[in-house]
From Swiss-Prot:
Pfam families: Ribosomal_L20 (PF00453). The keyword Repeat does not apply. It is found in: Plastid, Chloroplast. Binds directly to 23S ribosomal RNA and is necessary for the in vitro assembly process of the 50S ribosomal subunit. It is not involved in the protein synthesizing functions of that subunit. GO terms for cellular component: chloroplast; ribonucleoprotein complex; ribosome. Belongs to the bacterial ribosomal protein bL20 family. One of its GO terms (biological process) is ribosomal large subunit assembly. It comes from Huperzia lucidula (Shining clubmoss). GO terms for molecular function: rRNA binding; structural constituent of ribosome. PANTHER family: 39S RIBOSOMAL PROTEIN L20. This is Large ribosomal subunit protein bL20c.
Length: 136
């Protein structure tokens, strides 16, 4: 049986792995074995954290909505219950943005929901829809 020479293939593979590890510190960017281990670890972490980022943002939005709702004397759970009861379809990201950047509109939403009125978006303050982004 003839000998299979694959030095060029192996060199190319190692070179590509080390290119992926080019920004790593110390031996992780120069030695193939440690670099390969760090690449595997980095890819696993990025895969895991893509799902974690979604959970973290949802938790942040819920915290912001809860804080804004409690400033108006309503708990988060009661606020969400009123949303579902009045069939308002709005996600937590949008509600958190309204709570931060337009507190008057958020207060109006809370009052209308707790009183049982239907919500019409034209009743919100015009600054919110003018395109200006105010920082708190």
């Amino acid at each position: 049986m003839t000998r299979v020479k694959r030095g060029s293939v192996a060199r190319k593979r190692r070179k590509n792995i080390l290119k992926l590890a080019s920004g790593f510190q110390g031996a992780h960017s120069t030695i193939f074995r440690t670099g390969n281990q760090q690449i595997i670890k980095a890819l696993a972490s990025s895969y895991r954290d893509r799902g974690k980022r979604k959970r973290d943002f949802r938790r942040l939005w819920i915290t912001r909505i809860n804080a804004a709702a409690r400033n108006n004397g309503v708990s988060y759970t009661k606020f969400i219950r009123h949303l579902y009861k009045n069939q308002v379809s709005s996600n937590r990201k949008v509600l958190a943005q309204i709570a931060i950047f337009d507190t008057n509109s958020f207060s109006t939403i809370l009052k209308k929901l707790s009183s049982g009125e239907s919500i019409r978006y034209r009743n919100f303050s015009p600054e919110f829809y003018s395109g200006e982004v105010r920082t708190p």
